[in-house]
Amino acid sequence: MQWHCLPFEQLTTHQLYDLLKVRVDVFVVEQNCPYHELDEHDRHPDTQHLLAYDNDQLVAYLRLLPPGVTYDNVSIGRVLTTGHARGKGLGHKLLTRALDAAQVQWPDQTIDIGAQDHLQEYYKGYGFNAISDMYLEDDIPHIDMRLEKAITR
């Protein structure tokens, strides 16, 4: 497994294509949510893109956003593993690496996420707690969650 954590400007054209393709595959096609997948947050100079490759195939991805971009705190979004890579513990490795990267980039900062409601217990396992009621985003139940003062795992 090859891991890369890069700002937008350091992504290769192949990495950019790969991450946009898997995001559309998962969030637009698989979850049947026809919405604009691209936004200005990807290009923010402090946004970090965390990519995991297995044999030159992008199998997991998320982005780390600095405070003030989507939440007042640091945030993690667009968390995904590709279909054939699921059920192998890759999501846990991805989130652990994300928390470590956030600690390096923004030491001891609180982290917020807009989690799909059915993943609440998963994120609780990392110390996140619900901070909102359930709400619909693109017709999918979500809940805001927070990890106070992220620590290296």
Describe each model-derived feature in a short phrase.
Residues M1-Q57:
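Short amphipathic alpha-helix that is part of the acyltransferase structural core
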Residues D39-H44, G68, L136-E137:
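A short beta-turn/loop motif at secondary-structure boundaries
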Residues L51, Q57-P66, N73-S75, L80:
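Conserved beta-strand in the GNAT
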Residues P67-I76, R86, Q105-Q109, D139-P141:
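A conserved beta-turn-beta hairpin within the catalytic core of GNAT-like acetyltransferases
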Residues T81, G87-D100:
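Conserved acetyl-CoA-binding loop-helix of GNAT-fold acetyltransferases
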Residues L95, A102-Q116:
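Conserved GNAT acetyl-CoA-binding A-motif
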Residues D112-G114, K124, N129-D144:
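Conserved catalytic-core motifs of GNAT/GCN5-like acyltransferases
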Residues E148-R153:
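Generic C-terminal helix-cap and adjacent flexible tail
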